[in-house]
Swiss-Prot record:
Residue numbers binding S-adenosyl-L-methionine: 21, 64, 115, 186
EC number: 4.1.99.22
Subunit note: Monomer and homodimer.
Stored SUPFAM superfamilies: Radical SAM enzymes
Source organism (scientific name): Synechococcus sp. (strain JA-2-3B'a(2-13))
Organism ancestry: Bacteria, Bacillati, Cyanobacteriota, Cyanophyceae, Synechococcales
Cofactor binding, note field: Binds 2 [4Fe-4S] clusters. Binds 1 [4Fe-4S] cluster coordinated with 3 cysteines and an exchangeable S-adenosyl-L-methionine and 1 [4Fe-4S] cluster coordinated with 3 cysteines and the GTP-derived substrate.
Protein name: GTP 3',8-cyclase
Amino acid sequence: MPTVNYLRISLIDRCNFRCQYCMPDEAELTWLQAPERLTDEEILTLVREVFLPLGIDCFRLTGGEPLLRPGLEHLIRALCSLPGVRDVALTTNGFNLSQKAQLLYEAGLRRINISFDSLNPETFRLITGRDRWRQVWAGIQVAHQVGFDPLKLNVVVIPGLNESEVEDLAALTLERQWHVRFIEFMPIGNAALFQQAGWVESEVLRQRIRARFGLEPGFVAGNGPADVFRIPGAKGTLGFISQMSECFCDRCNRMRLSSDGWLRPCLLNESGQINLRDPLRAGIPAERLRQQVRELLDIKPDINFKGRDTGSQGSYRRTMSQIGG
């Protein structure tokens, strides 16, 4: 097992989209109220006193939609300034990015992932539940102009919706130094659609792209599990995240912290979670919290390998937006 050095921090469970694979309109969700969410100071305390001493020094801010969190740029500035923090990145749906990209960059953020599931505005509306393609595309352009590098676009491939666009989405990397990542559809968030539509193996997508453009090994900076390739001569790269077809538990280097303070060692397994918010608010010393997290790190390999649920059975109590993706 690799060293766990990467934490995904969900800042908010709310979102201004209703993506079919995450938070569909028909989902019955109860939003967290502000007092239930970790405050900026609580997040910084956990990072400074619990995670950094354990060697976890790379952080990704997620949601929900993190750009909905008030004062996000102040949290980013404080997080980036903590001694020992090696990397801070953010994942967003891009809707508010045109207005906020410059502020985020000035706060110290350099790496950003944007969900972008279709080049077709109507298909985009069907997937996200909102008619906001143009605003997101504009946000991508602004983020590129501001200087985010690498700029990554996340594509969840859903049969019958955007599967036919894979080659066109891959072509975005030909003249742009972008990283387009194709993510296998998972059952978390919308099990009914997963059962109905299924998912497409990354290898099938690679074969299609290889047939049209060719494909060679590539590299992009980051901390994720993507297998990286490049179209020969392209400025950008392609990534494939194959959590359904190609188990990468043996190279998992991450944990997830929900916006209400639950630390989760594995995306596909709900066992082993620990609550950090309540003991932190109760004044429990940081050393005791570190020990809890240390013990969770010790058992993470067993949770990854022995408790992994591929979605073929069981159910998930939390949606992707509540977990933090």
